[in-house]
């Protein structure tokens, strides 16, 4: 079994070296469906006489490793792209159990890759930064201090509310907050939904068409990609909102 756990860009660069070792009866294991789903763009086309399988943990590699060492695990999706040996399912589930998956749900390489890229650009990372920044900016533009704007936008969300609705659901959250917050949340969730859904639809179509994959391939293949990435991350890190975060984190009770 050959495990391909490299970044999407790296898979493309090492594929010519890897492919000769994929002899009949072996298995090629992925943790993400990108390379196979957009094989017309990545050039990753496995031989037909091997198993091609995937277990995709629903979280970061850092979280997966930390939880594994603690005897816990992330939930994972799994998929079989090719079953040349008749053992692909057994191999896949064994790996899923071996990495400590809380539970395993079946998918396809295409569905995993499409939902993953949508999530990363949407609610998991891209959209959440956009939403937080928009609210922070409006509060600051209306005279609120950096500390107040950050606490009401980010700190309360991440330190207090997220753990609660992660454990109990959003209905529980709404049932266990102040009546003022409850009424406002119920009234405003629909305008936010209606404003955001067209953006998510546009994003999904960009992912499904392969456009997002191509953007990723093109940008990651540039020789100065890392340099430009560091510049973008530096700008984010040095923005007022995230500089305020540094101060606020230092003031948490556990840090004093």
Give a label for each model feature:
Residues 16, 20, 133, 137, ...:
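A broad, structural surface signal
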Residues 86-141, 147-165:
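Active-site-proximal catalytic alpha-helix in oxidoreductases
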Residues 6, 10, 84, 127, ...:
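Catalytic cores of large soluble enzymes that bind and process phosphate-bearing ligands
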Residues 12-21, 134, 174-179:
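Short, basic, helix/turn surface patches
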Residues 29-121:
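Rossmann-fold dinucleotide-binding core
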Residues 141-256:
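NAD(P)-dependent Rossmann-like dehydrogenase/reductase catalytic/cofactor-binding core
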